[in-house]
Amino acid sequence: MLQTGDAIQNARDSAPRTRKSSTASVSATIISMPEHVITEDFGRPAPSLPSRAQSDYTGAGWRGGRNYEQGSSSTHQPGVTAASESWTMVLNSKEVKNAKPDEDTRSQRSVGGRSVASIRTTSEFAGNDSSPNFKSQLFAKDSQISVLKTKLSEVERKFEKRSQDYYEMKAEKEMLEKRVENQKVSSHEMDSLQELKLARQKAQDQKEKAVEECNMHKRKIVGLEEEIRAMVEQLRLAKFNLNENKKEFDEYKNKAQKILTAKEKLVESLKSEQGIGSSDRPVHLLQAEVEEIRVERDLTKADLESAQLQVYTLRSDMEELEAQIRDLQSQLSDQKRTHLEEKQTWDSTIGLLNEKVECSRIENEFTKQEMKRQGDQHQSKMLEKENELRKTISDLRSRMRDEQTKQEDDGSSQLTDLLLQKQQQLEDVLRNNQVLNVRLERLQKATNRETSIAVDSNSSPMHTSSSHPLLSNINNPQTRNALHTVDSTAFKLLSMLRGHPSARLFFVLYFIIMHLWLFFIVLTYTPEIH
């Protein structure tokens, strides 16, 4: 049994090479053809056309007859009609109807519930019908098949491109979901920022308590210093009194010594006079005078002993006062040292908390700016993608309309359905992207509302947005308007700095110059010594 390709080759060798016209009319009975045919070349639904056998049969003629194809391009549509009529004639011929099952025929195949009529391509049929019109019609149909092939490949490339865009949009969707998760993480960081703020507030309260305790201890220290000054004054008075008493005692001692010497001289003179003129004065008078002198001497000794005892007591009191003063001074120095250490620890703790709060605020601002920048970039990308998709959809629609007007085959309907399905998928992706954009904007607004908190260093409020709850707690409209004006002015200034690089450069230079000037003043400042 001959193969189909051999039969077509024999028909090609026996058929003449001349072509007269591509618009020859062939009388045939038109029969109904199936809408979709699975060809061997494509493997997908296509118009009801001969597959590889007819392509092999007409390939050489098509390669040698491009000039004929260009010459008959103006009558391409009638040639297509004539080709369809010629194939109807072939299907209605007696050789096809009377073909036996064991001959070289293509059996009927079921494609989607439809059957394709088998045709006989043997040498007998080629010998009976080998007119040039039939060849020209085959050439026209082959050209139409090649055009459809190119269009189908182009549509497949577009479909692959749309699929790639779809996967890219899906990846962007996943990226947006990850960004939403990152925003949730940033909200957790904001919770930690709130905790740091509460810890800073507690530290400030503890600092205030420590300052109050320090003031109380300072008052105690002042009282102790006053007591020390009073004791020092008492000690000075005691020393002065002791010196005065010493002077008086020395004077009294000198006087007593003089009196005693005078008395002794008097006694000696009396004794000498007693031996000379004992008869002149009585003895009892002399004895009375001696006793009187002895009594005075005893009184003087008693006064001297009492003065010495007073001096000893004053010395002991002075030593006790000095010991008390030393104890008070040591206690005062210990209290001062402990208070200074506590103050240094509180200052270091508050400085660390302030640094943490400032770092958190800077990170929050940077995160907000980064999110805004990414949102703007994503918005611009989404707009570009939407414009490209709209343009592509419009191009596809226009081409689909052109193809629908140009093509009369039923195979284009399936491609149209496929393109419409892809268009619907693209529209769904666009709607999903719009929904994601709306969610992103809402999340950004919510994040802006949550992150605009007042972090004040040394009781100075931070920048607050117009949606901050502090503004809603202010009942005075003038104060609220003033705060809103300051907030909007700061926001405009920041937006101007963000949009103008020269303004940012000027601000940075101004910032550096001001800090250098401040450091110069701090380093060269010498306080006046009065």
UniProtKB/Swiss-Prot annotation:
Annotated stretches, region: Disordered: 1-26, 41-116, 368-388, 453-477
Membrane topology, as annotated: Single-pass type IV membrane protein
Compositional bias annotation for Low complexity: 457-472
Keyword Transport attached: no
Record bears the keyword Transmembrane: yes
Subcellular location: Golgi apparatus membrane
Keywords, alphabetical: Coiled coil, Golgi apparatus, Membrane, Transmembrane, Transmembrane helix
Pfam families: Golgin_A5
Biased amino acid composition, Basic and acidic residues: 94-107
Transmembrane segment boundaries: 505-525
Listed name of the protein: Golgin-84
The organism of origin for this protein: Caenorhabditis elegans
Gene: golg-5
